C-alpha cells in the first residue's frame, strides 16, 4: 500500500492540515499517559489533555466555539481492522508520526466497503489535521515499534455511550 503524506493533494478529499496551532503543550501532555501493554486504547475526554493551553484555541478556531472534548487513541496498531465516521469533523494531533487509513463514506455500497479503496496518509508529529465527517477512519497505525499516541478532538459527547432509540434506517444501526 502506498503511503501518502497529508501534505499531498491526495489528502484533500479526506481532510486538511490545520495551521497556526501550537501543539507543543498537547504533545507534552500525551507523553504523560502510559502506553497499554498491547493493542489500542481510546478515551473520548482526558482531563490532562483538556487542561492544556490548546483546548480553548481548538474549541474556538477549529469548532467555532462549539463544546469539544479532547481524548486520545494510543497503543499499537499496524493494520486496518475497522472503519467509522462521525457527523462532524475530527482533529488529530500525534505525539509521534502516525498513519491514518482513510476512505470516503460515499464509497460504501450496499453496506459494504471495498478495502482496496482505503488510502494511507502519514501525519508528522505535532501536526493538527482535520478529518472530515464524511471520511471513514479508525485507530491510527504506528510508524515505529514504540506505538502511537494521537489526540482526538471531537464535539462534546461524540464516541460515548450509544443512545437507546428505535432504528428506522439501516444507518441508524451503525450509529
Where are these regions (language model features)?
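Alpha-helical transmembrane segments of helical membrane proteins, especially in multi-pass transport
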Residues: 130, 138-139
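Active-site region of the double-stranded beta-helix
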Residues: 1-125, 139-146, 151-175
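Tight coil/turn sites that cap or link beta-strands
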Residues: 125-128, 134
Amino acid at each position: 500500500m502506498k503511503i501518502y503524506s497529508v501534505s499531498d493533494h491526495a489528502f484533500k478529499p479526506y481532510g486538511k492540515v490545520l495551521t497556526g496551532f501550537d501543539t507543543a503543550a498537547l504533545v507534552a501532555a500525551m507523553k504523560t499517559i502510559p502506553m497499554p501493554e498491547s493493542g489500542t486504547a481510546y478515551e473520548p475526554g482526558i482531563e490532562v489533555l483538556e487542561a492544556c493551553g490548546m483546548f480553548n484555541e481548538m474549541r474556538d478556531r477549529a469548532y467555532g466555539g462549539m463544546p469539544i472534548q479532547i481524548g486520545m487513541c494510543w497503543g499499537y496498531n499496524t493494520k486496518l481492522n475497522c472503519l467509522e465516521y462521525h457527523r462532524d469533523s475530527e482533529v488529530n494531533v500525534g505525539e509521534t508520526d502516525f498513519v491514518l487509513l482513510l476512505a470516503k463514506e460515499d464509497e460504501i455500497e450496499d453496506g459494504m466497503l471495498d478495502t482496496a479503496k482505503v488510502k494511507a496518509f502519514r501525519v508528522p508529529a505535532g501536526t493538527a489535521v482535520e478529518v472530515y465527517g464524511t471520511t471513514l477512519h479508525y485507530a491510527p497505525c504506528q510508524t515505529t515499534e514504540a506505538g502511537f499516541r494521537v489526540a482526538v478532538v471531537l464535539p462534546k459527547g461524540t464516541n460515548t455511550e450509544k443512545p437507546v432509540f428505535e432504528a428506522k434506517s439501516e444507518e441508524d444501526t451503525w450509529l
